[in-house]
Amino acid sequence: TQAAFEADHGMRLMAGTEPEMMWLRNKEDGTPSVEGLSKPYCYHIDQFSEFQPLIHKVMEYAGALGLDMIQGDHEDAPGQLELNFNFDRAEITADNLTTYRQICKQVGREMNAFPCFMPKPFMGVSANGCHHNISIWKGDQNLFDPPDPANPMMPGDVGKWAIGGILKHLSALTAISSPTVNSYRRLWDTGFWAPVFADWGFQNRTTALRVSAPGRFEYRSVDSAVNPYLSLNALIHAMRDGIENQIDPGPPEERNIYEAMKAGKDVKRIPMTFGEALEALDNDEVIKASMPGEMYKVFRHYKWDEWERYCATVSDWDVEEYLDILP
């Protein structure tokens, strides 16, 4: 997909990710608990310092394997760290994210900790996201750079069309970038900045797409369970559709999206269950084409099976809610 995008348009996707995950304590028998190694204090310096031996080990292995580590912080869930590496071509970033996850798994073995990439292991605190930071380049030119110095956050036409393409296909994209039943717990646990509305804005964390800095935007409808090869490939297809058809995303929403809706704005919600997202993907030929050959059939088979097995399960909630019901 990247090669075809370059051949047809001379453009390439550059991407960076924000791989949040939680470090959990192991039980005495070596199996993971649901207890974080730290408390849910965001950007807490002392908690970040407590993680230094673990972080240094991750950094050591990452450097040895060619990852350019640039930044890290403690996020606001138990044991939640985000350690970032530099952006690159989309296919290289996908390789790097996969390598980073394997590094964390190995460090966990060595330090008796469990690296958890489950999107929502706890309710009432932030989930594990994996925001994708996106730009499109042509040679040495970033096509997302703002053409008007007086409006430094507004991308040029190509950037706006790319955003328009993603908004058009966002429901189908969600099935790929939020690819588990558990992913949608993240969307229902409100108040923790998970996006549920198909809109875009400048520094607006209530929308699914956010222009976070001049020259790039943040795709927020994605979590820690994502397969980056599939998500970045699908984003190229969505943006290509937007560019080729000059899809207008509309003006950026600068209000809190909930305030905008109270004022009468009609905003589409993204799918709120995995089944709804999979139905949207079934009906989107552009995004389905991002998984060529037998790939989409295989993805569809296993993901619909996952959803149907969940629907056929009696949960603890069912028992607690209905066991003693007397109609």
Predicted regions mapped to residue ranges:
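Glycine-rich, acidic/polar active-site loops that bind/position phosphate-bearing ligands
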Residues: 1-327
